[in-house]
Every structure is written in C-alpha cells, then in structure tokens.
Amino acid sequence: MALVTVQRSPTPSTTSSPCASEADSGEEECRSQPRSISESFLTVKGAALFLPRGNGSSTPRVSHRRNKHAGDLQQHLQAMFILLRPEDNIRLAVRLESTYQNRTRYMVVVSTNGRQDTEESIVLGMDFSSNDSSTCTMGLVLPLWSDTLIHLDGDGGFSVSTDNRVHIFKPVSVQAMWSALQSLHKACEVARMHNYYPGSLFLTWVSYYESHINSDQSSVNEWNAMQDVQSHRPDSPALFTDIPTERERTERLIKTKLREIMMQKDLENITSKEIRTELEMQMVCNLREFKEFIDNEMIVILGQMDSPTQIFEHVFLGSEWNASNLEDLQNRGVRYILNVTREIDNFFPGVFEYHNIRVYDEEATDLLAYWNDTYKFISKAKKHGSKCLVHCKMGVSRSASTVIAYAMKEYGWNLDRAYDYVKERRTVTKPNPSFMRQLEEYQGILLASKQRHNKLWRSHSDSDLSDHHEPICKPGLELNKKEMTTSADQIAEVKTVENLAAMPTVFMEHVVPQDANQKGLHTKERVICLEFSSQEFRAGQIEDELNLNDINGCSSGCCLSESKLPLDNCHASKALLQPGQAPDIANKFPDLAVEDLETDALKADMNVHLLPMEELTSRLKDLPMSPDLESPSPQASCQAAISDFSTDRIDFFSALEKFVELSQETRSRSFSHSRIEELGGGRSEGCRLSVIEVAASEMAADDQRSSSLSNTPHASEESSVDEDQSKAITELVSPDIIMQSHSENAISVKEIVTEIESISQGVGQVQLKGDILSNPCHTPKKSTIHELPLERVPAPESKPGHWEQDESFCSVQPELARDSGKCAPEEGCLTTHSSTADLEEEEPVEGEHDWGPGMHSGAKWCPGSVRRATLEFEERLRQEQENHGTASAGPTLSNRKNSKNDSSVADLMPKWKSDETTPEHSFFLKEAEPSKGKGKCSGSEAGSLSHCERNPTMPDCELLEHHSLPAPQDCLGSDSRSKKQEGDLKKQRAVVPNQECDTQAILLPLPKKIEIIEYTPTVTSLGHTEPGGEATPSKEGEKQGLRKVKMEQSITMFCALDENLNRTLEPSQVSLHPQVLPLPHSSSECDRPADPNPMLSSPQDKGDCPSTPFKTAAPFVSCSTQGASFSLDYLLPHSVVHLEGCTEQSSATDNELSPEQASWEDSRGHFLSSGSGMAHTSSPLTNEDLSLINKLGDSVGVLQKKLDPSPEACRIPHSSSSENIRDLSHSRGVVKEHAKEIESRVIFQAGFSKTSQMKRSASLAKLGYLDLCKDYLPDRELVSSESPHLKLLQPFLRTDSGMHALMAHEPSESAGAQQNPQPTKYSVEQLKTSECIVQSKPVERPSVQYAKEFGYSQQCLLPKARPELTSSEGGLPLLQTQGLQYTGPSPGLAVAPRQQHGRTHPLRRLKRANDKKRTTNPFYNTM
C-alpha cells in the first residue's frame, strides 16, 4: 500500500470560481490556488482510494516523484484528473479486467458537492489504450441513484444495477474489489439517504460527463455489454466431482479454509475466482454450488480484517485498511499510529502521530531491533491517554509480532502467554517463523535485562533485586523461563505462602511445603528454592522478585503489592514461604527502617535460584533429619532443618560447575558486596539459600525455611533468583560466610583456584560429608547463601551454597568475582575443604567456611591481599585440622578465623550468609565425625546470622560487620571494612577475640566467632556477656544498616545441627544441661542462653566452631527458646544461640587468642560502644566481664569434655569454664525472667536501640539464630536478658526453638540491658573469642545489647519476631528431638557449639581446618 499525490489544475473549460470547493463534503481544501492543488490517494495494486485531508489543517505534500510502490497508478490518476471538472474529485479508482490484453480499464467513483451541500457520486469508466499511456478516455457514465444495488457474481466480480441498467465490474484483485465495494456502498447509502432519483434536481452534472464520452466503440461496448468481459472461470476439472453430502459441514469447513487462504494470500494479487479455486484444491471438491456462500463469507472475512482489533485498552492491531479509515480511527480515539511496513505510507501525517518501522514481512527482517522503540511509542500513547494503532499490511505478522513483544515487556508475560493473548483477540495473528524466533530471543533479553536492572537497582539501593534475577541466567543453572515457571508453580502448588511480601528476607530456609517438596523431589520435578541475600525486604527487591515472576507471565505489579505471587514465580516463592512464616515476615517488614533498607541495598543481593527437583531431592535426601517443614510438628521441622544443616552442601556439582557458578555469582555479588561494604556493614549480607538435593521430607523442611524467607517480597524475588541458584537454595550461609564474602571480594580467582586445589584433595570426603552436612544444614545454609551475592555457586550446588556465597562476596569486586568463581566451583565440589580454603582465601567466604572446622579463619584475610590472606588462612586451617582437638590452635585460628568469622558473620548478617555456616559444616564434617556437633554450632551460627538478617538491624549481622570493621567503618562500606579488616585482621589473627572487646578477656574458645571478630575488628565484644546478662553490640550501629537485612539469615541455623551441618547436641545432651548443651564447643554459648547475646554469640560461635576442630562433638547449641517449626525458625531471627565453635577446640583456640583477644575485645568493646551507638552499648569487657567470660569458657570446656569425646572438644579456652557455665545457668534463670519481661517489650518494639552492638558482637551472630525481630526486640537488653535459656534452646530449635529463642533473647536482652551487671552480657565477639561460649551464662550487658541489636535487626526484618517464634515452635520439636530435648530443662543454656575449627585460630589454622574439613567432611556427624 502506498500513498501517492496527484497534481491537478482546473481545466480551461472550467468556469467555476477559483474558490469553488471540491466535491468531498468539504474535505477537499479550497482551490484558492488551483495550480498548486494536489490530491492524496492510498494505493494498492489495482486500486486507489482518496484520502481526505482530515481537518484540512495541513497542506497535502506536493511530490512530483513517482511512488515506486504505486506502479503506473499514479500516472493514470494524473491523467484521469484532466477529464474531471475542478470541483469534482475521485473517490476511488479500481482497475478492472479487460478482454483486451493491452487495454487498461478503471472503474472510477467521482463525487462532488451537490445542491444541498450533499455528496453526489457517479461511476465513470475510464480507458487507457495501453498500460503506459498518459492519456485516457471516458467510456461509461453511471449515476448512482437511490435504487442502486450491488451484487457479487461469484466469479471474481460484482454487478451494479441502477435505473434498470446493469453493469458488471471485475476488479483485478480481492483487495481492489473490497475497496470498490466499500466506496460504492458509501455512495449508495448517501443516495438512499437523500433520495436521489432520476429526474430530480440531483446528479444534474451527470450530463457533463455523458457529453464527454470519447472512448472508442470497442471500449464503450465493453462497458455496456460486459457479457464478453465476464471471463467466466472454467468449470472445475472432472477430478473434483465429489460434493460433500452435508452442506452445513461443508460450509463450516469452507469458512475455516477460506479464512486461512485469505490470511495467507496477498489479496492485492489474487481474485475471488482464484481464491475459490484454491479453496477447491484444498478441499478436493467442486464448490460451484457454494460460490455464493463463498463470496459472502469472503466479504465477511474482509470486513473482519478491515476493522482493527482492540488488544489492550490503548492498543489496536490492524491492517493498512484500518490505517486508512480516518473516520473509524477518530471514532476509536486513535491518535498514534505505529506503521510496521516499508511499503505502506502514513496516510494522515497531519492528523495522527506516526512512528514508522520500515521493514518487510520477510524471514531476513530483523524486527527485534525495533521493539524497544515501538514499546516507547506505544507507552507514549498510553501515557497521554490516547490509543495507538499498530498496523502492517494485514495485521497478521509484523504488527502482531510487535504487539506481542509490547505485551511481553509491558506486562512481564512470557512469549506463550503474550502470543495466546493476542491470538485470542485477533485470530489471524500469525508471526512468521523468523519473528517467532525473534520473540523467543526477546523473551530472553527481557529476562536478562530484568536481572540486570534488578542488580543495578540493588547495587544502587537497599534492594538485592539485581542478583536475584541474574542467577536465573547463570550457566550453571540451565533453567529456561518455562522451567523456572514450572518450578515456581510446583512450589506454589505444593504450598503457597500468602504473606510473602510481609516476610523480610530473614533467614527463611527454602521450605517447599512437605507435600510440595516430596512431590517435586520424588517426581524429580524442578522445585524453586529461594536464595536470599538481603536481610531486608525492599521495594526494589520486591520489584525484582516480581519481575522474575513476570518472566512467568505474571505482572510484576501483582506480586509487588502483596507478594501474593500472582505470577508463576511469585507463586513459587510463595509456596516456598511458610504460611506461618509469612505473618512474621509481614510484621517485620513494616518495621524496616530506611537505614535497614539502605543496609539491604548495600548488602549482597538476595539470590534466588531454581534448583532442579532432582537435585533438591538428592540434597534433601541427604538431610537425614529434615522432616516435612510443612508438617505441623514443629520439632519435626526443626529436626529436618538440623539434618539439612548436617548434610547441607555435601552434594556438590562438579568442581567445574561450581567454579563457573561461583565466577558468575562472584561477579554479580562483587558489585553489590563492594557497595555494601562501602555503605557500611560493607559485608555482603546476602544469605544465599541453596537447594540441596535432600530427602523429600528434608526438602520440605528446607523449603519451609525457604518459604519463611521468601514470605517477604524479597523472598519472592529471591525465589526467581533461586531458580538460577537452585543449588544454593538449600544451603545456609553462616554469618561467617557473609564476612567471607567481603574479604572474598579481595580474593583473586587464582587464590580461589589454589584453595580449590587444596580442597580437592579431600573432595571425595567433602562431597560425601558435604551432602550429608548440607542436607541437615540445608535450611540454615540457605539463608546464609541467600545473603551472599554469589549466586552461581549456590545454584550449581546447594551445599557449596554458602561456600559459593563466600565466593560471591569475593565477586563483589571484579577480581574477587573471579576468585569467588574459582572458589565457588571448588566449593561446589568440596564444601568442607573449599569452605576452609575459601575462608583462607576469601574472608567473606569465611561464613561459609565457618561450616568447615577452620573455614572461618580464612574468611577474611583482607588485612593483606585476599590471596595472601587466603593462603594464610588455608595454612591455619590445615593447622587447625591438624590441631583439631588442640586448644592452642584455637587462638591462632580464632584470630584469623575470628576476623574471618567476624566478616563472615557480618556478611551473613547483611547477606544472610547462612550458607557460610554450611561450608563450615562441610568443613567440620571433613575434619571429623564429631565435628557434626560443630556443624551444628555452625548451623547455629548461621541461624543466628539468619536472625540478624531477619532483623534489618540484627545485632548479629551488625556484630559480624563490626568484626569485619569498626562500627563506623562497617557502616561506611565493605571496602573500608575490608581495609580495616586487613589491618585489624592482622592484629586479630593474633587476637581474634579482640573483635569482641567485651569478650576479649574471656577468650572463649569460639574460634569461628573470633574469626568473625577478626574479620571485622570493629566489632567489639558483641558476644560479651556480663553477669548483667547484657550484650554489648559494639558493632550494632555499624551493622544496623547491613545487619538489619542480614539478621534474617542467621535464623536459618538450628542448634540441632552444627553449622557444619552436624547436630551439635544430642537429645540427651540437650536434656542434660542447657548450659552444657553448647558442649565444650559452645561453652560461651551456654552463657548465651542467659542472654540474647548467646544468639549474638551464635554467629560468634559459628566463627569459633569452624576454628575449633571438628572432633569436638559439642552439640550445636542455639538458644532457641521456643520450638517453632523449622521453617519458622529460619523465617524468624532464631533465638537459638549457636555456640558454634564453642567446642573444646574452640576453647583451645580462644585460649590461644586469649591475650590478643582480651586487648582486641577491649578495643572492640569500645568499638561496640561507639559503633553500635546503642543505649546499652557497653564499653569493652571489663576485667570482671572478661573473667566472667573466662569462667564461662571454662565451664564450656568442661561441658565440651563431657559432651565431646575429642580432647579438643573437651578443651575449653581459659575464658570458658564450668563456673561460667553455671553462672550462665544461674543468670539464665534471671535472664529468663528478664526475658519474659523484655520479651513483651520486644514484641511491642520493632527495633533494638542497641542493634549495632548486638550485631557487632558474636552474640549478634548468635542472635541471628534467635527468632528476634526488630519488633520483638525493642531493646538489645530485652533480648539478652529475657531468654537466656531460650537462647540455649534456640540452637536446638532450628525453627521453633529459634523463634522462641528469639523471643527469649529479646526479653533477655532487654533485661540484660536493664541489668547491665548481668553476666549475660558475654558478647558474641567474646563467644567468638572463646570457642566454648556458654550461651546461657550472662556475662555483661554488652552482650544483651548485642542481642538486642540483633533482635532489633530481626525486628526490622521481622516485625513480629515473637509470632515467628511461635510459628517456629512447630519446627522446634524436630530440632528439639535432634538436639533440643534439653531445651525445656535449661532454655537459657542451649549452646550450639559449631565446632568450627580454628574459629579463633589464626587464618593459618583456619586454612588448615579448611583443608581438614574438606578432607574430613566424611567425619561430620549429626548428633
């Protein structure tokens, strides 16, 4: 179709005035300048249709050039105008068939303004002697009276009868005939309306043309007789003689076939006779009897094709004819026209706003390149409240493809949904195969751009949206859009959590409802697992989540508002979220402060990966104790989660896959991580959830936790990301992992490779143990991983999830990204070994390594170069492994590890690096079977971290971050923190406990925690617990931003399992003595129950545990006050105090670090006071506090000896003692009361005033395990003092206990804060400092503050921490069954020694432990 302009001048014979208006109802412009008059026509092959000038405001363009698409029609129109009067105008010119080969004949409809200003029309027959003739003659004049009738003759033409005259016209094409019929019907309608009849005063000007008939006789005869021109179509061949017996059935078939033919054929080049012939060919029968029916149907179809189709309220899809129908366009409110053709011109340039896409409907056409422009044009029309017509020639291929592309981008639909939607409204829609391929490519581009957009969003805002989506495209995770949708749908079907948006990205394990998990796992279907990197939910995160959901055809808006998950992916996330968890998230989310949001933005993005159901199944299977999280039994859920911890991440993909995934994740994470570090709480606080292939029931538990996490909008988006990082979903990263991620940023790929190589030696064991550990640890691990920016690793392997996250932290920086890439693969292969190496290489990875015995030490070797630190860390890990049960190794490892743990804890808090704990678990498993207890500690730590993550201001996260950096620095950013860490780390390596100023003197054997401290020197005695039962969150202020988001992460870990995925405490052990529950490994942690600090210390424990040898079988002691379901525990900041690293070894490690620890902790305590900026922030531990801590450490040592067969386990740092344990026990009672008081206060207060300190202390890390919400922990003090025993229980209760512990911790902290003198105040750093932190024993107020801070963070994330605790109770029984049988007896003393070797040991020991862990992975035992 083309637009041609014809110049015309009045003929000399004309006597009409120059101003006489042309016949066209005033549509023609006045001929004030006759010589410059031009007319515009819409031309197709064989026809020209006059185009009115609209409002006449624009002068028609004057072009003397011939339109290449008009053929000779433009020339013929020019010749025809010579025969017309100046006042007359051509309405239509249609080329007709002729009996003479070289003769060209046109039926011309001419109109003019009549006597009463009405339009009068006649039909003229014009003859051209030859096709190229420039002159024409007139052979027919036929006035159109009111009695005019038009009939189709069935042979490609129509007859016009009027005043007893009948003339037959046979246009050269169907399109030309359609144009003629339209014009004739309009003219006849006007004639009937005004009753034009022969002899009246109308059409008197016909005589002028009748007197000018000048064609030769043969032409005149053709016009008059017409019989010989009819060119009847010959009869059909004898072949087609069978007439269908059922006429009705035949007509239906004719309708269908006819529409197909007319849609496929170029109607400009085919006649109705040819269409009927084609129809007969396809139907294999003679349709002569149906020719009338066929003609009528043809007209109906043409009419349908001629009217534009309304696809959306503001979008019409049509053909060139629709674009040429001015009246119809104006009636429909169209002001914008998108012309997707090269051959069709813009018909009304002065009336409509046009945008042209000059392309042909060909296979080679690249239409995709224009879709961004077309989207903007259509959006512009929508923005201005107008409507847009998108047209090509037929409205079938080019324009339809463009509208489909618009729908995909505007509404986030997938190709199938958009295509079906458009096809349903315009049945003729049929993009050519090339356009369909381009639409598929565009779908991928939109998906990738969403991910990039989200990443950018997260990197520039509080949200972790960016990484969430990017993982979807991770090579490691080969999930296409449909697969992702399917996974999400499966999860949604299995279990839908309605309040996904409400739930902050607290550590919520991926808990696909058990049914769903079992279904998906057993059916080997793909299940979505969420991997959350952020502690807080942000609009951006939600948006990202929604976007991912949109990928599945749901509008992002639908999920955004309520995370109801209208989208497929959203539903998946929802399914992952536990209904019980959802409310908690919702409650916490409202409490998120701007600070929290900022922190979240700084944190590593939340990652959600879809893990193939097969992988999930196997990993879940690996989780021995992971019951259906969906099941009502809280203990069952908790146990399942614990089991997940124990076996979490053992099942890795190939090292190569892991490496690839890590590399990708590292890149994405490096940006978010560095940004997070810069912002302060620079730790990548992304806790990444990895999907581990576990038994279906275990998977369900994990999914529940995951669901808890995904209950928040953040979870939702993570759910999508998790699809990419499906493997990492089940993994829980411990706070240490978060720290590791930060240091990891500085790690180089080379370092990672080196670590991988070192780890590869124990790969076999690690993988086996890793699977086992990763499954038990799975849930907590997930959270941690979730936080980690690194997502590709988690996707490939759930266990490596934390590990990967550590690497992803590395990837935060480009170089780190590469390094992490290396680490991730090796992590994927060897969770335990890799974790250790990563800790060494990448301090940020430390959290992940925390799971490993010495993994934490190397987490943050930022002091020097990442590589240097990594090497040193590996060395120390190896030493730690060697000195598995030696306390002397503890201090060195603790220092190194502490720094790393600190950073890991910080990372975990900010990044939900529960995964970190998982690597630790893996590591511990490697080190020894007894290390399973440590694994639990690690899990506990991860749980604590989860808690921190949950609460945007969770002290645990803050603590971790503070450990990584000074409180202020932590806030500043990961980079500054890393630098400080490097300096501090060097110092801390010697004195890891220093990170916990308050706990420094205590020097509890919590190497992992200590490492966290080392990681962030700024974090001072987070875990310090003083008799006052308070926690000093020196890091609270610093970590508030990051930690708030990261708190969520620590929730994941349950005390039932070590962070090494080992059950820290056996049921009998738990029952025996809450204080002893920590086992030698959790000596400090035992103190923790007395104070929310234990929770804070849980991360510290985690850090310590990794440092401590695996041999310590100290049960994983989390202070989980209430038995909530596993998933809830993850959802809520666990009150479980994971005395990770509180093993003999931990104690020994602490002892090593004791001198440094004291000084370091003192300094840290100051940091806590200043950094946390909390009311209850305590100055560095006083001598009294240190002594208290030491006593606790001794007590823990005794407990460890009793609980842990290994000498190292029995070994307790000088800071931990039975006396301390007893003190913790006693303070537990006091704290318990306080906890009750504070618990109520905490419930009503969303945020902790002392979040920073809590976060900064190891207690904060432990608090991460507490199910503390910002809402629940109005005061760190509340958390600390209220539930010391709850804290103890929490380690055992992954979900339930975690929740209760959180509640208990919140009140405990408040009470602790009030009771500044209470011993509950051992800080998490203290815990870290001493591997054996007695969680139940209050040491000092700082710890409470830390706990409060942790609780605050959690509250920020989980406004209803207490409700979450309650929800967690369902899962608690499971956890209790595993390791919390003792929870009831001494709720405050539940200690989850994470047995993270060398947590307090130097990096060297950590490295050694890491290596050991890799090799010792098989030793992981779930007690």
From Swiss-Prot:
CDD domains, per the entry: DSP_slingshot_2, SSH-N
GO terms for biological process, alphabetical: cell differentiation; negative regulation of actin filament polymerization; spermatogenesis
Residues modified as Phosphoserine: S17, S25, S36, S461, S487, S534, S631, S633, S1217
Low complexity biased stretches: 9-18
Compositionally biased region (Basic and acidic residues): 910-932, 976-987, 1033-1042
GO cellular component terms, A-Z: acrosomal vesicle; cytoskeleton; focal adhesion
Tissue: Expressed in brain, heart, liver, skeletal muscle, testis and thymus. Also expressed at lower levels in kidney, small intestine and spleen. Within testicular seminiferous tubules expressed in germ cells and spermatocytes, where it has a cytoplasmic localization, and round spermatids, where it concentrates in the acrosomal region next to the nucleus.
Reaction(s) catalysed by this chain's protein: O-phospho-L-tyrosyl-[protein] + H2O = L-tyrosyl-[protein] + phosphate; O-phospho-L-seryl-[protein] + H2O = L-seryl-[protein] + phosphate; O-phospho-L-threonyl-[protein] + H2O = L-threonyl-[protein] + phosphate
Protein localization: Cytoplasm; Cytoplasm, Cytoskeleton; Cell junction, Focal adhesion; Cytoplasmic vesicle, Secretory vesicle, Acrosome
GO terms for MF: actin binding; protein serine/threonine phosphatase activity; protein tyrosine phosphatase activity
Chief localization: cytoplasm
Residues spanning the membrane: none
EC number: 3.1.3.16, 3.1.3.48
Pfam families: DEK_C (PF08766), DSPc (PF00782), PH_SSH1-like_1st (PF23040)
UniProt keyword list: Actin-binding, Cell junction, Cytoplasm, Cytoplasmic vesicle, Cytoskeleton, Differentiation, Hydrolase, Phosphoprotein, Protein phosphatase, Spermatogenesis
Active-site residue numbers: C392 (phosphocysteine intermediate)
Protein name, UniProt field: Protein phosphatase Slingshot homolog 2
